[in-house]
Amino acid sequence: TGSEGTIGCLDSDDCYTDAHGVDVDYLTMHVWIKNWNWFDPQRPEETLPAAKEKVRAYLARHVAIADSLDKPLVVEEFGCPRDKESYVPDSPVSIRDDYFKFLFDLIYENASNRGPLAGSNFWAWGGYGKPDQDRTYWGPGDDATGDPPQEPQGLYSIFASDATTLEIIQRQGQAMRAVKP
């Protein structure tokens, strides 16, 4: 019974309290700063600081819900486009790296203080895939880049060449493994 969080439930906490009984082991949530219009990749300096504050508040709300239900919480989908929303694998990722580090720090801080945050799953592993530069959306025979076919290919992809992002993800994995339950 995965959930996007309260945004996917008309901004109501009831999606958790009504659907997560004793047979559900943990809660999930998404954080989509671009899709939810909290962040504009064409104006990152203007919009990223406010987006981070919205993320902080949204996460705190879900932590409180998880606490009230005595369940762990996983940020199971989140992503941020490459700089200037480029889909090209070798384009810069400095904004995404900044955002990932911010979100990972919030998750780690909560987990290391015995809060309900138990982990996260970034969206999405693109690996060695390459988006077709002649069209935006996936087509038969195209590489898989992690993004669904109805979204621009490479929009949220983490490619094998994204060394700085992969380093941030690896550090978060190591930090979370060291957290004692």
Indicate residue ranges for each PLM-predicted region.
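Extracellular glycoside hydrolase catalytic/binding regions
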Residues: 1-109
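Aromatic-rich peripheral "rim/lid" segments of glycoside hydrolase catalytic domains that contact
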Residues: 16-23, 50, 85, 89-181
